Regions:
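Catalytic-site signature of metal-activated, phosphate-bearing donor transferases
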Residues: 33-39, 57-222
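Alpha-helical transmembrane segments and their immediate juxtamembrane flanks
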Residues: 225-226
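Hydrophobic targeting segments
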Residues: 1-3, 195
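A conserved acidic beta->alpha catalytic loop
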Residues: 4-13, 28, 51
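Short aromatic/hydrophobic "clamp" motif used to bind/position activated sugar donors
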Residues: 47
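Residues lining hydrophobic/aromatic ligand-binding pockets adjacent to catalytic sites
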Residues: 5, 44, 54
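Conserved donor nucleotide-binding strand/loop of the catalytic core
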Residues: 12-43
Length: 226
């Protein structure tokens, strides 16, 4: 099943070639609401939730076919390998996500510019990985980051400090994050060894954190408290 939010790039033509697919249309308002809409339509006991730019590795496909979950098992999380224009990176800031879970137990909540699944029960890691093959044109990526930065700034300011992770508390300060993220991505995550693709990703994360820092400063300087 696919939830489409108004594709104009030929996506629907590709989907129409596979008679197994069921396509539902819904105007986009938030990632969480879009996912919850999709969940409300799922009739199976388990659901594998994926973005359009996810690709399952062969190892993960084989692993999923052999799963025999117990009654207490509510979900499984997978690690990601990020690709820049098809080139895999050694490490990224993209965390493991719960992608396979019992349909009736799942509910998405908004978190910053993104979303997070809430499950009650055992969630185990999977051995295989998912490739996150993001091929957005640079202009489109930059445009989307403006909206993401505004929502992320609101989340960081509105959430009590004790509920934020250490990383998010640093990000809420504004100025440290843009400087730290470049070195963290290049050195700690090994993107320096990925050549031009690694630098591209590091600069992407730098721009994203600069925009979040600007959004935070804008709110503080204008006296706005969303």
């Amino acid at each position: 099943m696919v939830v489409d939010s108004g594709s104009t790039d030929g996506t629907l033509d590709v989907l129409a070639k596979d008679p197994r697919l069921e396509v539902h249309h819904r105007a986009f308002d938030s990632f969480a609401d879009q996912c919850n809409f999709g969940l409300s339509l799922v009739k199976t006991e388990w659901v594998l939730s994926m973005d359009a730019d996810y690709e399952l590795s062969d190892r993960l496909v084989s692993e999923l076919r052999q799963l025999t979950p117990s009654a207490q098992q509510m979900g499984y999380r997978a690690r990601f390998v990020y690709r820049i224009h098809g080139r895999p990176l050694r490490g990224t800031l993209y965390p493991p996500r719960t992608v396979l879970y019992r349909t009736r137990m799942g509910r998405y909540e908004k978190e910053g510019h993104g979303h997070r699944i809430r499950l009650s029960g055992a969630v185990s890691p999977l051995g295989g990985v998912i490739y996150h093959d993001d091929r957005k044109p640079l202009a489109r990526w930059l445009t989307s980051q403006l909206g993401y930065a505004s929502r992320e700034a609101a989340h960081l300011l509105e959430t009590p400090s004790e509920q934020l992770s250490r990383t998010d508390r640093i990000r809420r300060m504004g100025w440290p994050a843009p400087f730290l993220v470049v070195f963290y991505v290049l050195i700690a995550k090994g993107a320096l060894l990925d050549g031009s693709a690694g630098w591209y990703y590091a600069f992407q994360r730098l721009v994203a954190e600069v925009l979040v820092a600007l959004a935070l400063l804008d709110r503080r300087l204008s006296g706005e408290r969303a």
